[in-house]
Amino acid sequence: MNLRFWLFPALLSTALCAAPAALAQTRVGEAVVIQNEVVRVAAATTPISVGDSMLRDETVRTGADSAARFVMADSTNLSLGPSATLKLDRTVFNDEHSYRDVAIRMTTGAFRFVTGHSEKTAYKITTPLATIGVRGTTLDILSQRGRSVVVLQDGAASVCTTSSQCVQLTQPGDTAIITSTGGKVSITKTNTPPWTFAANCAASAGLCAVNQYAGASPTITPAVQDDGMLCGR
């Protein structure tokens, strides 16, 4: 029997498993509420269902009349309203149930953010106009073209523009409004919010509930061969 006949399949299998290794991704949370069209955006757009993993460095988008809630590994709850886009820029684990560093970019749409068990300094939330630092916080965040609104529901937060103009939110209802007009960015503070996430909560059952993360410790999603077999199994 020609030795090459036996060696080639083995070498090919090794190469196929090694090549996608970079594609293996870390599970950092899971979807607990999915209403209508919710997708992850990468090289291809794929739908997300309840129970699906939330992966490090991924972008999530909701469609019109759609909503979603994700629970991260540290029990942070992220709720998205219709036509929202969220990017997990960075997640660095401290241990299996907390983060040392997590950066979340809320590009467009309406969101509710409830902190989990990580140190509050670990969280960095950004919109195109603002950077938000949290301290034991429930926040409603609206990101629109030329305008961001940050409403404190509980805890405290610091909201800064990209030019380091900052306001401190310390009382429920405290609101930072950041606007960009003609290239000039300004920030104001009020205790009369022009908007909150409450209407989204009322429209979608479970969207604004708060759950602890029930999954196992963060796991690596193995690369899968074309025949559906897991490499290394």
Regions from the PLM with identified roles:
Residues M1-A24, T46-S49, A73, G81, ...:
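C-terminal interaction modules
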Residues G29-T179:
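Structural recognition of beta-strand segments within beta-rich domains
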